[in-house]
Amino acid sequence: MAWLVLSGILLCMLGAGLGTSDLEDVLPPAPHNCPDICICAADVLSCAGRGLQDLPVALPTTAAELDLSHNALKRLHPGWLAPLSRLRALHLGYNKLEVLGHGAFTNASGLRTLDLSSNMLRMLHTHDLDGLEELEKLLLFNNSLMHLDLDAFQGLRMLSHLYLSCNELSSFSFNHLHGLGLTRLRTLDLSSNWLKHISIPELAALPTYLKNRLYLHNNPLPCDCSLYHLLRRWHQRGLSALHDFEREYTCLVFKVSESRVRFFEHSRVFKNCSVAAAPGLELPEEQLHAQVGQSLRLFCNTSVPATRVAWVSPKNELLVAPASQDGSIAVLADGSLAIGRVQEQHAGVFVCLASGPRLHHNQTLEYNVSVQKARPEPETFNTGFTTLLGCIVGLVLVLLYLFAPPCRGCCHCCQRACRNRCWPRASSPLQELSAQSSMLSTTPPDAPSRKASVHKHVVFLEPGKKGLNGRVQLAVAEDFDLCNPMGLQLKAGSESASSTGSEGLVMS
C-alpha cells in the first residue's frame, strides 16, 4: 500500500512539472530589453507618465521613437542615447529639466524631432545641442528661457521648424539667427515672449518664405512707425503669420503694459506716422516674365561682393553650386542662377541669400518669375475671312441677278410654258363678252375682287373694224407679253380707247 501511495505522489509531481513546461512554451516571450515600466510596440518605446526621476537603463536598440514625456526628469546624462542608433523622434516634454548640459545628445545624429517643451530651461548654451546635425524640428516652447547664446543653434544645418513661444526672451538676433542661417529655416515662432525691441532692417531683410511663418504676436513691442509700416505691408501681402493671428499683434503706446493696443484695429495711434518712411524698409521683389522654352538668368547683386551665395527655389529647394536636383537649374561660379529652358514648374519666387564679412547683415534678393506659355501661330484661314468671302459671293450673285440679261433659250421656254398655262387656246363667246364688259365698265370692281384677281389681261378695240354679228371684235395686242401680264400697255394708235368705245357697243 505504501508503495502505491509513493508511486502516485511521484506521478503527480511529474505531471505538474510537465504542465508548467507546456504553459511556459505557450506564453509569448517579453520584448527584448524592454523595461518593465515601459510599453514596447515594434519600434516605438513609450515610458510616458510613469513618474520617472531618472532615465531608464537597458533600452531596446530597435527603438525609433522614444516617449519620456510627463515625468519628473531633472537632468540628462552624457551619451545616454548612444545605443539608440535608429532613434528618429525623442519626446521629453512636461518634465523638470533645468539644463541640458554638454554631450546630452551625443551619438544622436539620426534624430529628426526633439521635443523639449514645457520644462524649466532658463538658458541655452552654445554646445547644448551638439550632435544633432540632422535635426529638423525643435520644440522649446513653454519654458523659462531668458537668454540664448549667439551660437546656441550652431550646427543645426537641417533645422526647418523652431518653436520658442511662451518663454521670457527679451531679444533675438534676426541677423545671425543664433547660428541657424536662412537656408533651411521655414518656421520661427517667437510669440508670447518679452521682446521689447526688434531691428527693423534685419527683420525686413529676411526672405519671404521665412516672413510667411515668422510669428511675433503677443510681444510688448513699442508702437513704432517703422514697425507698423512693415507689418502693415506684410498684412497686405497676405502672409499667413499676419493673417492667421491678426488680432494678436499688439504694441505699447506707452511704456506700461496697460497701454497695449492692437496694431490693425487702432490705426489712429499711427496717424502721425509719415508714409514716406515706409519705402526703403523692405526691397520689393523684382517681377520677371518668361515664356516656356526661353533661357533665364538671375543675378544676386548685393551692395558689396559676397563670399557665400545660395538660392532657394519656389519649391523651397536649396540651390548651391553646381545645380539643382533635377538638373534644370544651375548656380554659376559668380553666384548667378541660370535656367536653360524655362518650364511652368519654375514659376514662383526665387530668393538669393548672400553673406560675407563685408556685409553688415545677410542680404536677400527676391525675383518673382511668371512663366507664360508660348502663343500659338495665327490660323491661315480663320472664321472672319470665311464670312467676308461669303458676303462677297452673295453680292456678286445679287448683281448678276439684277443686271445680267437672261438667255434666249430660257425666254422661249418661259413663253411656251406661260402660253400653255395662262392663256386658253380657244375662248367661248361668253368669255369674250365678259372680257368686254369688264374692260368698258365705268364702275371699278370692288377692292377685294381686285385683290383676288391676280392675272388680268388688258384688251382694247381695234379702230376701223366693225363689230361682227352685232358684237365688237376684241383683239389682243401684238406685243402682248404672256409671261408678264402685270406690265401690259394699251396699243398705241391714232385713236384712243374712248373714241373706240364711241362707235357703239352691242350688249346682249
Curated annotation (Swiss-Prot):
Residues 25-61 form the LRRNT domain. The chain crosses the membrane at residues 384-404. Residues 405-508 are cytoplasmic. PROSITE patterns: IG_LIKE, LRR. LRR repeats lie at residues 62-83, 86-107, 110-133, 134-155, 158-178, 184-207. Residues 279-370 form the Ig-like C2-type domain. Glycans are attached at residues 107, 142, 272, 301, 362, 368. One of its GO terms (cellular component) is membrane. Disulfide bonds join 34-40, 38-47, 223-251, 225-273, 300-352. GO terms for biological process: cell adhesion; heterophilic cell-cell adhesion via plasma membrane cell adhesion molecules; negative regulation of neuron projection development; nervous system development; positive regulation of synapse assembly. Residues 1-19 form the signal peptide. It is found in: Membrane. SMART domains: IG, LRR_TYP. Residues 20-383 are extracellular. InterPro entries: AMIGO, Ig-like_dom, Ig-like_dom_sf, Ig-like_fold, Ig_sub, Leu-rich_rpt, Leu-rich_rpt_typical-subtyp, LRR_dom_sf. Ubiquitous. It is a single-pass type I membrane protein. Residues 219-275 form the LRRCT domain. Coiled coil: none annotated. GO terms for molecular function: protein-containing complex binding. PANTHER family: AMPHOTERIN-INDUCED PROTEIN (PTHR24368), AMPHOTERIN-INDUCED PROTEIN 3 (PTHR24368:SF62). Belongs to the immunoglobulin superfamily. AMIGO family. May mediate heterophilic cell-cell interaction. May contribute to signal transduction through its intracellular domain. Binds AMIGO1 or AMIGO2. This is Amphoterin-induced protein 3. It comes from Mus musculus.
